[in-house]
């Protein structure tokens, strides 16, 4: 086989070659004519015809292979691009000993250029600063309400509680002002995550309060008098308890005497009875305090009979 130097193939030439691709019959006729020119005086034998057919078939397969890989759609993508310094082109050609037809393949790869990084600032006067929109009073209230919804950490709560305690101890005693603001925002010194809106109560229809400043001696004396008034004497309490106990004991004695009045009493009738009476033998026993029964018992003893009423 004889290798021919193929010209450089570009994207445009490859497209034109694909458009002008010969058919199988034309390549077969070209191969037959060339074989006849190479062997003058000899008739086309069977071996010559087979060789020509094999060469034509091989050329046709090469043409189909080239047409498959180099389509017009692919060639059109290279039309707008010019081969740059980074483009590489490689070509290879094959030719048969039986004909002058040659097939070439070309591959070109283009590397995209990277955009340069801007390292300089374009000179010129800076543009006007955007105007700040005026804040509405409603926006601040909404922001405070959003802060109320945010959860506070336990450390911030503890710090705020301690700061409020120490601030209350250090603050001097000042009279409450009657004309206070209607609404005031209060927040701790350590954390601004929580805020509350407090409204001072109105002082209309209430009694006026007065504040007096006293010296340390006067203040101690006033406090001692108040304590003495509140203190109850111990001796008075003891006397009251003793009187109460005596009254209770007297009531108990009265109740016991009333209960003993129903019991029997023994009287010595022998001292007043005449001599030789029956009272000397035994004493009358009264088991009741009823006067009618006592008289009946005494009447029975007066007749010389001894009777015991059960």
Curated annotation (Swiss-Prot):
InterPro entries attached to this UniProt entry: BG1-like
Region listing for Disordered, in residue ranges: 81-141
Domain of life according to the entry: Eukaryota
Keyword Plastid part of the UniProt annotation: no
Keywords: Auxin signaling pathway, Cell membrane, Membrane, Transport
GO biological process, one term: positive regulation of auxin mediated signaling pathway
Keyword Membrane in annotation: yes
Transmembrane regions: none
Compositional bias annotation for Low complexity: 90-106
Cysteines paired by S-S bonds: none
Entry's family note: Belongs to the BIG GRAIN 1 (BG1) plant protein family.
Protein name: Protein BIG GRAIN 1
Species for this entry: Oryza sativa subsp. indica (Rice)
